[in-house]
Amino acid sequence: MIRSYKCVDNPSRAINKETYTNPKLMAEFAKAGRYISLPILPIISLCLGVKFENGIKAVPIFEKIEEIDLQMDYENQAYKTMVKALEILDPAKTVIEIRGPLATLDNLLELTKVMRAMKKKREVLNDLYDKLSDIYIDFIKKMLEKGIKVFSFSESILDPKVLGEKEIARYVDDFLEEFLKKVLLLENNYKFTFHLCPKSTFALIDLDKAYFEEIKFEKPKKYIDILFSENSLMGDRCINLADKSFDKVNKIKIGRNNA
């Protein structure tokens, strides 16, 4: 059985419209949270052409899943603003947030149509998973080159109460497992931590696609400090617990535990 995970609340903060276009204001906003993080809007979706009403609600740009054309535009002004904000901050202390493919496709199309495609357009959906996987890896490489040390990858809809266990298992098989293998290959050239939302983590663990390896500390450490020091795949708890301290956590190891 795949466990559910109750998200840890991270209350939204009021944001001035100018913050979306002003690197200095964006950097100040990024520093004011529980941990320093960018972007303040889903940058992958923005670079794929999505607009956000009032900085919150995505305006889908496709009617049918077959119409989706995944062309990343790194000349997008939102991306350039984020990079400038990152330069103001310390990249080595900034978490880069990435939303998973279901969230991105929701922005591009609308979630109800994506869920319909899970049943009727599986091949089209899997092709989009493959393309998004490559887009994510390319984006991660760009951020690593700028000195980023921690990434947070979330897929908030990945809950058996919403999608059902069968669809979550398909998501893991068709996207997540292979994507994470690509991420881990980057460790050959870079040192960084890749943090998964626990919803993804427990899907992997409960489907026997991964296992935990415990790390203990002599004294409790803030979770955010652990993430910046471990250089590994992690995610046994929500990143919104960044300011909480723990004396032990778990790394995630892909594959079966044969020990």
Stretches with model-predicted labels:
Residues E18-T19, L41-Q77, V150-I168:
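Glycine-rich, proline-tolerant flexible connector loops at the mouths of alpha/beta enzymes
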Residues G49-E53, E97-A117, K146-V172:
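Active-site-proximal loop/short-helix segments
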Residues K131, S152, L180-K181:
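Non-heme di-metal
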Residues E53-K142:
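Active-site-proximal, glycine-rich beta->alpha crossover segments in alpha/beta enzymes
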Residues T94, F151, K191-T193:
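Hydrophobic/aromatic residues located in beta-strands of well-ordered beta-sheets
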Residues N76, D138, L158, N258-A259:
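Metal- and O2-centered redox machinery and metal/ROS homeostasis
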